[in-house]
């Protein structure tokens, strides 16, 4: 009977020792797993933070490019525009070019095709080093322009000329030299996108924009 009790206590002792060792190993393994998890989490957070920093830098770079783009190619909508000088004289009329909507370099949905530095580059003449001060591009079908020219003539500021007023606002790009005194090929223009009624002299395609229309 005593031997049985001794054996029983001995077995219990071994069991407790086994549980203690097992518990210790389990705690060590759990601590190791937690430590590894913390390390992975720390590395992930560090990587995520670095990615965010790089993304922020990329975003800042994009915003900078957009800012530079808008600074170099200003597109604005003035409340009123009064044209006051021509590139060859001071008759308060502007030379104009009518663009058909099928014009290959013009897409109504693409504002960059309306950017004046691009449009005016085709107007620069190698023998004339003076930049054209102002110019208007009319983005309408030729038939629409011809229809204006068939309307009754109205008074305009062009001496000895006959002008005709459009029945509706036209889609226009008004290009104005950003600073006076510029010479080709370094002509920098400000771009105005307009929808205005126009007065047009159909014999020489000079245009005046109607203020407030």
From Swiss-Prot:
Male-specific expression in proximal caput of the epididymis. It comes from the Eukaryota. GO terms for cellular component: extracellular region. InterPro entries: RNaseA (IPR001427), RNaseA-like_dom_sf (IPR036816), RNaseA_domain (IPR023412). The N-terminus is blocked. Glycosylated. Its main location: secreted. GO terms for biological process: defense response to Gram-positive bacterium; heterotypic cell-cell adhesion; positive regulation of cell-cell adhesion; positive regulation of flagellated sperm motility; regulation of fertilization; single fertilization. CDD domains: RNase_A (cd00163). One of its GO terms (molecular function) is nucleic acid binding. It holds the Pfam family RnaseA. Belongs to the pancreatic ribonuclease family. This is Inactive ribonuclease-like protein 10.
